[in-house]
A protein has these predicted regions:
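C-terminus-biased signal that marks the final domain/tail of proteins
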Residues: 13-15, 20-21, 30-32, 52-210
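Structured, non-membrane catalytic/scaffold regions adjacent to prosthetic-group chemistry
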Residues: 1-57
Length: 210
C-alpha cells in the first residue's frame, strides 16, 4: 500500500502555545526529495526535483512558476537585446536580475531554488553544512520586515539540517547564529524514552583579542 493510505491528518495542535498551521512537508534522503501536501481533496505526494519547499501556493504551482525565471543564470549575461547597441554588464551578478527579493512564499521558493541548484559546496562535511546554512540564509525572515499582526512579525526561528548517514542534527536559531549539533548515535537509540536537548539561544560571539 502507498504511504499516503497510512497517513491521517488530525486537527490537533503540536503545542497548546502554537496554532495549527497550513503546512506542506518535504521528505528527503541523500539523493531525492518528495513533497507531501494535505489539500481539501486529499493527500498529494509529488517528486521534488529541486529539493526545496515553501508554504503556499501548492507545489505544482510553485514548480510551474520556475518557467518564468528560466533565463536566470549565475553567469554574466550577454547582450541579446540588440547587437547594434553597446550594452554592458556593468556589475557582477547581473545574470540574476529579476530574481524575486520579496518575502512571499512563492518568491522565496524561486530564490532558494536558484540558490540551491547553483551553489557549490566543498568536499568536507563542515563545508557542506556551512553551505547549507548559507543557502537557506538567502530566504531568512528578519524581524520587522514581515508584519503579521500589530507589533508581531514573521521571523526565521531556526534553521536545521541532518546528516542522515551519520545521524548528526545541525541547527542555529534567530538569536544564535553559531551552528550547534546533536550526534544521535551518542544516545541509546533502542531506548523507549524521549531524549530532549534545550535549544541554545543567545548570540555567542568569539572575541579574538580577549
Amino acid at each position: 500500500p502507498y504511504i499516503k493510505d497510512k497517513i491521517n491528518i488530525v486537527n490537533t495542535p503540536f503545542s497548546e502555545q502554537l496554532p495549527l498551521a497550513q503546512l506542506h512537508w518535504i521528505i528527503s534522503d541523500e539523493n531525492e526529495s518528495i513533497t507531501v501536501e494535505s489539500m481539501s481533496d486529499g493527500l498529494h505526494i509529488y517528486d521534488n526535483p529541486v529539493g526545496v519547499l515553501t508554504n503556499n501556493p501548492p507545489f505544482p504551482q510553485q514548480m510551474f512558476q520556475l518557467n518564468n525565471y528560466m533565463y536566470l543564470s549565475p553567469k554574466q549575461p550577454r547582450n541579446t537585446f540588440c547587437e547594434n547597441l553597446a550594452l554592458d554588464a556593468y556589475s557582477r551578478g547581473m545574470g540574476g536580475l529579476g530574481l524575486p527579493g520579496d518575502l512571499s512564499s512563492s518568491s522565496r521558493f524561486v530564490r532558494v531554488a536558484f540558490t540551491k541548484v547553483n551553489a557549490i559546496s566543498g568536499e568536507s562535511e563542515e563545508e557542506s553544512v556551512s553551505q547549507f546554512f548559507h543557502i537557506l540564509g538567502s530566504v531568512d525572515q528578519q524581524r520587522g520586515c514581515c508584519e503579521v499582526a500589530d507589533g508581531k512579525y514573521e521571523i526565521t526561528l531556526y534553521t536545521s539540517c541532518c546528516n542522515v548517514t551519520k545521524g548528526i542534527y545541525y541547527y542555529n536559531t534567530y538569536e544564535n547564529h553559531q551552528i550547534s549539533a546533536v550526534d544521535m548515535h551518542v544516545e541509546n537509540l533502542d531506548s523507549d524514552k524521549m531524549i530532549c536537548y534545550p535549544v541554545i539561544q543567545g548570540e555567542r560571539i568569539n572575541y579574538q583579542n580577549k
